[in-house]
């Protein structure tokens, strides 16, 4: 699909640029700053955006790009490092700032931009500044530090701040000005369009006769994938497997399997809990656990279907943030953790891999699911990781620890639902810590587990803030858990945002 190409120079905010453009209806995709010019030309993008990055354009080994070539393809926007790169390569001058501009600042526009006020609050993060704009360019905004904050030239817009972050006021308006005002792009990226595109892509990739095996987890992503493929290929060619890996929440296997039958999926339930728990025995490293679970899933799938059927593909609900978190970028991003749908898969798969929603964010998947007719209660379940409770039991996974965690999680989530808080929260769960503490229960000394409660708000899983529960709620839930769940005598609440933490603990 025609849209915008975002070249990643290593900024932690690059994904937000894509996110913001899509929110406004403009399709966008992220590529390395080294993405070949000819490949960009083939995509015929409406516009090209150069992201920010941690480097200086003068540093040896800093990411570089021939921006003159890009200008011959479509309008170009530079953000932070992208502005410095444009200046440096087009004959302007970039120097080290005497005082670094970081965090909230204000800029004043000398030339009006549609939708953006003359004085604008922005988020900055840079140590270099533009001293002289390239020939033919005009400085159109300055910071309170008297440095150029934006410039414009033929087919080029560049800003020395981050319009994509929420801290920047009217940042969306600035991106919209580039997308519509300069690039004349139509805002045609929406759920009906996404559905039509993905159905056709699935039909083209799988072909007219091949069958697909879908591993269902009970979560939104795999459910939407199975429904989409069923719509595209027909239920007789889409074979869903829902595995009881022993790592699901309390009573989840039976309830979810029934809901799958109700929406018309061709699904088979498989009890493989002993296989998973046996494989996880003695493993405490989170990466080891994830990859072990990925391996066993493939082994279970391989035994769960009729090999006489022409099944050639394995489908997964991998999302864009999963891919982003699992791929190291030359521009400066680093691998955070392997995702169970990416790094956790064995290299020698017997089936090809199809990931229909790989380029979508979570809210886009939910919108797609609604377009496909899935009920609200299935679409708004909190995200649940493929490795399940194995990465919420820190350290080695045992049946005893899983039982404790299942009971505690059931108490916690039930209280959230009862008090009308569940739908206000992006994701909530319990984590069983690998430590025990001394306590007193019923006049007796105890030495039991510590349980952490986690609840975050987010729009796409890329960033997240901890949910500000009232203290009375935390007091009451803590009392309920320590009274009802044998094996827990201390409850703590995680008040870490993402970043610096990830949403899951492992």
Curated annotation (Swiss-Prot):
One of its GO terms (molecular function) is ATP binding. It comes from Bdellovibrio bacteriovorus (strain ATCC 15356 / DSM 50701 / NCIMB 9529 / HD100). The active site is at 80 (nucleophile), 162, 164. One of its GO terms (cellular component) is cytosol. It comes from the Bacteria. PANTHER family: GMP SYNTHASE [GLUTAMINE-HYDROLYZING], GMP SYNTHASE-RELATED. Catalyzes the synthesis of GMP from XMP. Its EC number is 6.3.5.2. This is GMP synthase [glutamine-hydrolyzing]. The keyword tRNA processing does not apply. It holds the Pfam family NAD_synthase. The keyword Methyltransferase does not apply. Residues 189-381 form the GMPS ATP-PPase domain. Homodimer.
